[in-house]
């Protein structure tokens, strides 16, 4: 059985998080280390990192806002974060491919959800990528 630990983000996590992000998203969609560092500098407590047996295997992150709907600009502009906002956004839910289908992503969502509830948020919001065959 894996030992699971979830913690909040720190400024010096950017490079490690970028490595996970790169493993989880196509290059055109993956946030860079610089983009992640900018987010961490503004809202580190809205990053949740999951370690399985001491290995960083995934993370979830997103800003807080008074807007119910996630806009593209929010990904690029960390200054849009409003700690007093009503809505916790989810920008990315990342799990390394070799650790998928183990329930780890669900644990990350639950950690963010519980934190949002404790902070009195109205809810959480995200977007998914559209695709067609």
Tell me the role of every PLM-derived stretch.
Residues 9, 93-95:
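Hydrophobic adenine-recognition pocket in adenosine-nucleotide-binding enzymes
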Residues 19-33:
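Helix-loop element at the rim of GNAT/NAT acetyltransferase active sites that forms part
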Residues 4, 55-59, 88:
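Glycine-rich phosphate/pyrophosphate-binding loop shared by adenosine-nucleotide-utilizing enzymes
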Residues 109, 116-129:
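Conserved GNAT acetyl-CoA-binding A-motif
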Residues 46-60, 64:
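Conserved beta-hairpin
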Residues 95, 101-114:
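Conserved acetyl-CoA-binding loop-helix of GNAT-fold acetyltransferases
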Residues 60-93, 100:
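Conserved acyl-donor/pantetheine-binding loop and adjacent beta-alpha core of acyl/acetyltransferases
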Residues 4-17:
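A short beta-loop-alpha structural element at the N-terminal edge
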């Amino acid at each position: 059985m894996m030992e699971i630990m979830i913690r909040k983000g720190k400024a010096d996590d950017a490079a490690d998080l970028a490595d996970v992000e790169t493993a989880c998203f196509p290059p055109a969609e993956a946030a860079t280390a610089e983009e992640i560092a900018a987010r961490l500098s503004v809202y580190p407590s809205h990053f949740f990192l999951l370690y399985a047996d001491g290995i960083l295997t995934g993370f979830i992150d997103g800003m807080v806002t008074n807007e119910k709907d996630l806009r593209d600009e929010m990904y690029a502009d960390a200054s849009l974060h409003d700690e007093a906002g009503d809505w916790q956004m989810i920008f990315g839910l990342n799990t390394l491919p070799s650790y998928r289908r183990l329930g780890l992503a669900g644990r990350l969502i639950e950690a963010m959800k519980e934190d949002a509830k404790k902070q009195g948020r109205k809810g959480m919001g995200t977007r998914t990528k559209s695709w067609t065959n």
